[in-house]
């Protein structure tokens, strides 16, 4: 009797100890991962997300950084630095070349990231959010005398070295230009054509006129010279100093001056180009008494438009500048009865000629073909 009771106790104890092993592999792995990543203090007690909000008065140079930089930062952090400088100054941020956080998911920084926001009395604007290791964030200058930096890490993966941001203030603050732009008449000459360069005094230049003028320029330098001949070099330097105010989810990567020039050149080079076009063979060859297999073929034909690369684009058409004929082998059928055996006289492999456009030109009525 005592042996039977002892056996029952052993069976029950063994079953109770291992009943958790019947959980699904997925739930077991998730549970183990979460338990392994719970934040604990020095006494091994579980703690919540660590939060800290710090105000910094910017009177010179300094820096903020992720904890333990340049080593791996801790998990479960939410740190905020609010930087303030004196009136009529701005704050400039520069990231250390050592930068690395947890990688993005589908190009979105969801988990570990550092974020910079412009702060004013009326609004808060996100200047950028960064993570991963591929890109060192660019230099940032605040729009006002306040800026906010936020660092967040979740309870899973961490990375190193983290980040370090150097801050300083910029003197001689000038308010941003008003939304209503005026224009000052300044004459400059490009390609023998005179234009009025926009500044801040004359309100006669319309958007259509400005758009037409911009079509003349091939480089960013020429465009900025047109806007402000006296200060275009400073404008060029400042143009690539600040990041955009808002980055959408589909943001690609910041373009340099060379990239912008290349994009503009690509538009002019490829807007009117030969491209694949499918043609119906009966319609193309104007044959009504035959059919072909395949019914359609791909040929190179001019396509696109001239609207972004030339002046007076409304009078321009994209036309072939060089046409060649190429042979294609197809199966041709002619109406009639088909024999089930033997050679059918009304079916044969034939060579046909189709026009292919090798070069395309923008033909404008206001000027001869280029």
Swiss-Prot record:
Disulfide bond entries: 109-131, 302-360, 306-362
GO terms, biological process: cellular response to amino acid stimulus; cellular response to hydrogen peroxide; cellular response to platelet-derived growth factor stimulus; cellular response to transforming growth factor beta stimulus; platelet-derived growth factor receptor signaling pathway; positive regulation of cell division; positive regulation of cell migration; positive regulation of cell population proliferation
Tissue: Widely expressed. Expressed at high levels in the kidney, adrenal glands, eye and CNS. In the kidney the localization is confined to arterial and arteriolar vascular smooth muscle cells and is also detected at low levels in the glomeruli In the eye in the anterior segment it is localized to the iris and ciliary body. In the retina localizes intensely to the outer plexiform layer, which contains photoreceptor axons and the synaptic layer between photoreceptors and second order neurons. In the spinal cord, prominently expressed in the motorneurons.
Primary location class: secreted
Top-rank lineage group of the source organism: Eukaryota
Subcellular location: Secreted
Modifications after synthesis and translation: Activated by proteolytic cleavage. Proteolytic removal of the N-terminal CUB domain releasing the core domain is necessary for unmasking the receptor-binding epitopes of the core domain. Cleavage after Arg-247 or Arg-249 by urokinase plasminogen activator gives rise to the active form.
Glycosylated residues, chain numbering: 276
Leader sequence segment: 1-23
UniProt entry keywords in alphabetical sequence: Cleavage on pair of basic residues, Developmental protein, Disulfide bond, Glycoprotein, Growth factor, Mitogen, Secreted, Signal
Transmembrane segments: none
Gene3D superfamilies according to UniProt: Cystine-knot cytokines (2.10.90.10), Spermadhesin, CUB domain (2.60.120.290)
Site (Cleavage): 247-250
GO CC term (a single one): extracellular space
GO MF annotation: an example: platelet-derived growth factor receptor binding
Domain CUB, first and last residues per copy: 52-170
CDD domains per the UniProt record, alphabetical: CUB, PDGF
Record bears the keyword Glycoprotein: yes
SMART domains linked: CUB, PDGF
Subunit structure: Homodimer; disulfide-linked. Interacts with PDGFRB homodimers, and with heterodimers formed by PDGFRA and PDGFRB.
Family designation: Belongs to the PDGF/VEGF growth factor family.
Stated role: Growth factor that plays an essential role in the regulation of embryonic development, cell proliferation, cell migration, survival and chemotaxis. Potent mitogen for cells of mesenchymal origin. Plays an important role in wound healing. Induces macrophage recruitment, increased interstitial pressure, and blood vessel maturation during angiogenesis. May play an important role in control of lens epithelial cell proliferation. Can initiate events that lead to a mesangial proliferative glomerulonephritis, including influx of monocytes and macrophages and production of extracellular matrix.
Protein name: Platelet-derived growth factor D
Lineage, opening ranks: Eukaryota, Metazoa, Chordata, Craniata, Vertebrata
Gene assigned in the entry: Pdgfd
């Amino acid at each position: 009797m005592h042996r039977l009771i002892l056996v029952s106790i052993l069976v029950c104890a063994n079953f109770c100890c291992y009943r958790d092993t019947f959980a699904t592999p997925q739930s077991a792995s998730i549970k183990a991962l979460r338990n392994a990543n719970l934040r604990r203090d020095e006494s091994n007690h579980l703690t919540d997300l660590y939060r800290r909000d710090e105000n910094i008065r910017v009177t010179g140079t300094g820096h903020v950084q992720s904890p333990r930089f340049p080593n791996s930062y801790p998990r479960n952090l939410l740190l905020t630095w609010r930087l303030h400088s004196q009136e009529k100054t701005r704050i400039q941020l520069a990231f250390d070349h050592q930068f690395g956080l947890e990688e993005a998911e589908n190009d979105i920084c969801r988990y570990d990231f550092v974020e910079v926001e412009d702060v004013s009395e009326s609004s808060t604007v996100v200047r950028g959010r960064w993570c991963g290791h591929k890109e060192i964030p660019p230099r940032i200058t605040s729009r006002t005398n306040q800026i906010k930096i936020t660092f967040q890490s979740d309870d899973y993966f961490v990375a190193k070295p983290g980040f370090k941001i150097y801050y300083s203030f910029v003197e001689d603050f000038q308010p941003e230009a008003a939304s209503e732009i005026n224009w000052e008449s300044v004459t400059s000459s490009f390609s023998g054509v005179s234009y009025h360069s926009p500044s801040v005094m004359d309100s006669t230049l319309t958007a259509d006129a400005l758009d037409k003028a911009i079509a003349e320029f091939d480089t960013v330098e020429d465009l900025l010279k047109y806007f402000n001949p006296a200060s275009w070099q400073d404008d060029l330097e400042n143009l690539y100093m600040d990041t955009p105010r808002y980055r959408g989810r589909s943001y690609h990567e910041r373009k340099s001056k060379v990239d912008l020039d290349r994009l503009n050149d690509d538009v002019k080079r490829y807007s009117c180009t030969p491209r694949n076009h499918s043609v119906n063979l009966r319609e193309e060859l104007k044959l009504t008494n035959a059919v072909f297999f395949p019914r359609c073929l791909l040929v190179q034909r001019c396509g696109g438009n001239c609207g972004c690369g030339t002046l007076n684009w409304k009078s321009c058409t994209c036309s072939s500048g060089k046409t060649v004929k190429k042979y294609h082998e197809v199966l041709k059928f002619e109406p009639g009865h088909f024999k089930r055996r033997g050679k059918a006289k009304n079916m044969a492999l034939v060579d046909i000629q189709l026009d292919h456009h090798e070069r395309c030109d923008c033909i404008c009525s206001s000027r001869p073909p280029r």
